[in-house]
A protein has these predicted regions:
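Catalytic binding pocket for nucleotide-activated donors in carbohydrate/polymer assembly enzymes
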Residues: 308-378
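Conserved catalytic-core segment of nucleotide-activated headgroup transferases in glycan assembly
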Residues: 57-66, 197-278, 349, 382, ...
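A donor-sugar binding/catalytic signature common to diverse glycosyltransferases
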Residues: 115-137, 141-144, 291-334
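Donor nucleotide-activated moiety binding/catalytic core segment of transferases
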Residues: 98-113, 270-313
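Nucleotide-activated donor-dependent transferases that construct or modify glycoconjugates
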Residues: 29-53, 233
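A nucleotide-sugar donor-handling region in carbohydrate enzymes
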Residues: 8-11, 15-32, 140-152, 156-240, ...
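Active-site and donor-binding regions of nucleotide-sugar-utilizing enzymes
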Residues: 45-206
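C-terminal amphipathic helix plus adjacent low-complexity
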Residues: 1-3, 8, 36, 207, ...
Length: 406
């Protein structure tokens, strides 16, 4: 590792984990890849990875759930880093768990007919004939700058370009997102506007009710309470300063506006997982950072509060979404936006007082109209059938290249 990387690892208390990862990538992975080079591809095996081994969640989870619910003839394997897993991570019994960055993980990637990931793969053997790689990514609408549009390290860019060369299908949820991917993903292959697999659940009322009950039971939330979910994104500096919110005042505003009891759940971005215990939340606010599946939390929520993240998914509900951006100018300089933040249809506040005022003056009819117009301008493709479309891609690929699953 370079000196700067070592210093950052020590500062973030990840030195030993980073050192192990470096040893794996530079020494063990080449050896394991060589040993697995001539192993046969098993067309009915799908290997999933979510946020570099963070467990059962996001788009890969919902593709797997579709396979299970429809009893499709695939064997599924999940790459797991146990140190990164959180509450709600238990895999279904039909899915095999394999340690992330291990000989078994390289062997699985070498033999699986299908790879599914929602982030850049930081290691993978050379693809063989008959193998396909579906990159789902992990966003719905244009928000933050990503990939070539963002300020990224040379190491990341080098790895991202290598990853893009291996991708067979890159998924998109709308035409604006597709254009962004064409511009900045270092990818010349096929982009398929299937919709976002994780968003299918937002079109299923039974699953929404089931998820709300699951969250309420786990956190002992009264079933009649309404839920505000706070989903801030990460900052490059990993500071917690922008997350200081007047929770008590916000709850008072919600109760005045909607005449109901409210519970607040705060969930940090996965990049901030190691800082979750430093939040110092009031006793009446639930720390939901260790709940792995954001979609389940979104299903349970009645209002979302965010800054620069997760706004697209939740707005599919046409439920209220508020943006709290106390460091807006700093964030513009640090990360920037794919489109001007003012073009979003959601109320934006820079202070706690402004946020409380926006809640009290919220107009549902005007909000719904703005959000629907935003959908049209983005060319939204979400209709609750993204997972079905992904499985058709797999079936068509395997029929064309391999003569089917069997």
């Amino acid at each position: 590792m370079k000196l700067k990387t070592i210093i950052n690892s020590i500062k973030n208390k990840t030195f030993f984990d980073d050192a192990k990862a470096s040893i794996f990538i530079h020494f063990l992975f080449p050896l394991y890849s060589f040993l697995c080079k001539k192993m046969k591809v098993e067309k009915d095996k799908i290997v999933f990875s979510n946020y570099y081994g963070r467990g059962y969640g996001d788009n890969p989870k919902y593709i797997a759930e579709y396979i299970i619910e429809n009893k499709l003839p695939y064997r599924m394997v999940w790459l797991i880093d146990n140190k990164k897993c959180k509450a709600g991570d238990a895999l279904p019994k039909c899915i095999v768990s394999v340690p992330y960055r291990s000989y078994k993980s390289v062997k699985t990637l070498s033999t699986a007919g299908v790879w599914v990931d929602n982030c850049r793969k930081d290691f993978f053997p050379k693809k063989k004939d008959g193998q396909m790689y579906i990159q789902t990514w992990h966003g719905t609408f244009l928000t933050k700058k990503i990939e070539a549009d963002a300020d990224l390290s040379e190491r990341y860019i080098r790895n991202a370009k290598k990853d893009s060369e291996a991708i067979d299908y890159l998924l998109s949820s709308n035409t604006e997102r597709t254009q962004q991917m064409k511009r900045c993903f270092w990818y010349d292959g096929e982009i398929v506007e299937t919709g976002c697999p994780r968003d299918d659940v937002l079109f299923d009322k039974n699953k929404i009710i089931k998820n709300k009950n699951k969250i309420c039971d786990f956190y002992s939330i009264p079933k009649n309470n309404k839920i505000l979910l706070y989903l801030p994104t990460f900052r490059n500096s990993h500071t917690l300063e922008p997350y200081k919110i007047d929770y008590s005042g916000i709850i008072d505003s919600l109760e005045k506006k909607f005449s109901e009891k409210w519970t607040v759940i705060t969930r940090l971005h996965p990049e901030m997982l190691s800082f979750a215990d430093k939040l110092n939340l009031p006793h009446f606010v639930i720390n939901g950072t260790f709940w792995n599946d954001t979609q389940e939390l979104l299903s349970a929520a009645d209002i979302i509060l965010t800054d620069y993240s997760s706004m697209g998914d939740y707005s599919l509900y046409l439920k209220p979404l508020f943006m709290y951006c106390p460091d807006l100018e700093d964030y513009k300089k640090e990360r920037g936006f794919a489109i001007p933040i003012e073009s979003y249809p959601f109320p934006i506040s820079k202070t706690n007082e402004e946020l409380k005022e926006k809640i009290l003056n919220f107009n549902r009819e005007e909000y719904n109209k703005k959000v629907e117009e935003y959908y049209k301008s983005q060319g939204l493709k979400e209709d609750g059938t993204a997972c079905e479309k992904v499985l058709k891609l797999i079936e068509e690929f395997q029929t064309k290249r391999c003569g089917g699953i069997k």
